[in-house]
Design a protein with these regions (language model features):
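Short aromatic-glycine-(Arg/Gly/Cys) micro-motifs in beta-strand/loop hairpins
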Residues: 29-43
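Generic structural motif
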Residues: 12, 24, 37-40, 56
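Short N-terminal "domain-start" leader segments
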Residues: 1-33
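Mixed-charge, Lys/Arg-enriched low-complexity segments
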Residues: 42-83
């Protein structure tokens, strides 16, 4: 089992076909990586960020995301690792 942090966003009513769905922050050793999921023209696309964050930077990043007008919630989850 590995831990991950998921930040969910509400749908943008002005642009219902183009909006961010969620960001998933996963630990990779002592750094964290970010995977973003967007809905673009009705299709879900996944983008892996090349940015590696420290523990303190992750906390600041979550606080920054919470300031978004489309922010919904943050979930701390334990998920099974890929087989």
């Amino acid at each position: 089992m590995k831990e991950q942090i998921t930040i969910y966003y509400d749908k943008d009513k002005k642009h219902p076909n183009d909006y961010i769905i969620k960001r998933v922050i996963t630990p990779d050793g002592d750094k964290y990586s970010i995977m973003s999921y967007y809905k673009i023209f009705g299709m879900v696309k996944r983008f892996h960020s090349k940015i590696e964050l420290s523990n303190v930077a992750v906390n600041k990043y979550i606080l920054q995301c919470m300031k978004s007008q489309f922010f919904n919630r943050v979930e701390y989850q334990k998920v099974m690792e890929g087989i």
